[in-house]
């Protein structure tokens, strides 16, 4: 189905209840209005952070899909040249001396770095491969690049994006795909690929984590928007590593949306005062927290487990160091 026809159909199913506005992260800070977008005003999508909360309250249509299309159109976005050159939506990181994952050729599964990790945090690939190895899962690197979730791809219809995913994933040959980004897992599953975020296998191996040397930190958890309903599972994982978890409201990191993200992050930071670090399950959240001036130090989930294993090799790449690292 043509993308414009698809979006028009989704808009026509909106009943105008306004619940999407009530839960919208951006709207609270003077940003987008999803109801106006659903009623045809694409310009009202300005300020959308892509949190997807609109989808969680709507039983009639798919407002997030419409919002992403609207953001794509009002910003005249096309698939970037860097994607055609590298397979990724963002330029590859220039960090040096990053520890190398110990991939196994023709392994039982593959690990997908995703665009954010490839661009700004390649050390998370090392941390995640090492944790999977700890759990008895050997991996080979997924070389298919981007999952086509990002907004620049939202001018394409589902058929076109699925075709890209199926073509770029041929190297899987039916094997399991683990992702570092939760959005990648959802996108790849939508194309019929056996994919899951790495936390899914971690949560099934808590006894392995409890047997590690451990790490004594007081932390908050921000799972990221896609995994917001899984905070209890994250808590069990973090506690199994030896940490104390301070409960805090789950929320979007705000990404890098001008005029919105600064306000969103200020609230996130204020809600977590006093912790040693915030543990996240999303690379986009990781990048946002790590870049926030004078903010709370951040650990990606597999980095925390890596620390519990006694390996701190990813810490030197952080902008904000975790000041209290004791085992």
Question: Model regions: which residues?
Answer:
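Conserved AdoMet/S-adenosylmethionine-binding subsite of the radical SAM
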Residues: 211-221, 233-240
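Iron-sulfur-cluster electron-transfer modules
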Residues: 4, 8-11, 27-193, 202-207, ...
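Selected transmembrane alpha-helices and immediately adjacent juxtamembrane segments
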Residues: 111, 219, 225-229
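Cofactor-cradling patches in redox/metallo enzymes
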Residues: 116-122, 126-200, 229-327
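Cysteine-cluster motifs in flexible loop/terminal segments that predominantly coordinate metals
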Residues: 14-20, 48-54, 256
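The feature marks the first
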Residues: 22-25
């Amino acid at each position: 189905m043509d993308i414009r026809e698809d979006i028009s159909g989704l808009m026509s199913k909106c009943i105008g209840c306004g619940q999407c506005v009530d839960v919208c992260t951006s709207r609270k800070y003077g940003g987008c209005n999803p109801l106006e977008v659903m009623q045809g005003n694409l310009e009202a999508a300005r300020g959308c952070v892509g949190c997807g909360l609109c989808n969680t309250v709507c039983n009639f249509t798919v407002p997030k899909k419409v919002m992403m299309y609207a953001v794509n159109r009002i910003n005249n976005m096309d698939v970037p040249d860097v994607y055609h050159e590298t397979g990724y939506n963002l330029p590859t990181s220039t960090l040096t001396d990053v520890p190398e994952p110990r991939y196994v050729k023709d392994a039982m599964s593959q690990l997908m770095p995703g665009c954010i990790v490839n661009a700004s945090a390649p050390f998370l690939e090392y941390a995640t491969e090492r944790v999977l190895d700890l759990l008895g899962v050997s991996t080979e690197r997924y070389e298919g690049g981007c999952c086509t979730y990002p907004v620049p791809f939202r001018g394409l219809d589902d058929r076109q994006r699925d075709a890209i995913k199926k073509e770029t994933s041929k190297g899987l040959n039916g094997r399991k795909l683990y992702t570092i980004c939760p959005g990648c897992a959802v996108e790849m599953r939508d194309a019929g690929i056996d994919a899951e975020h790495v936390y899914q296998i971690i949560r099934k191996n808590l006894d392995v984590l409890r047997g590690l040397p451990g790490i004594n930190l007081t932390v908050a958890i921000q799972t990221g928007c896609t995994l917001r309903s899984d905070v209890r599972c994250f808590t069990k994982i973090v506690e199994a590593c030896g940490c104390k978890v301070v409960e805090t409201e789950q929320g979007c990191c705000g990404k890098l949306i001008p005029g919105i993200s600064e306000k969103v992050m200020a609230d996130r930071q204020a809600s977590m005062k006093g912790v040693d670090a915030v543990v996240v399950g999303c690379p986009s959240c990781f990048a946002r927290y790590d870049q926030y001036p004078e903010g709370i130090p951040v650990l990606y989930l597999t980095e925390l487990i890596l620390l519990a294993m006694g390996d701190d090799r990813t810490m030197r790449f952080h902008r904000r160091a975790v000041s209290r690292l004791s085992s």
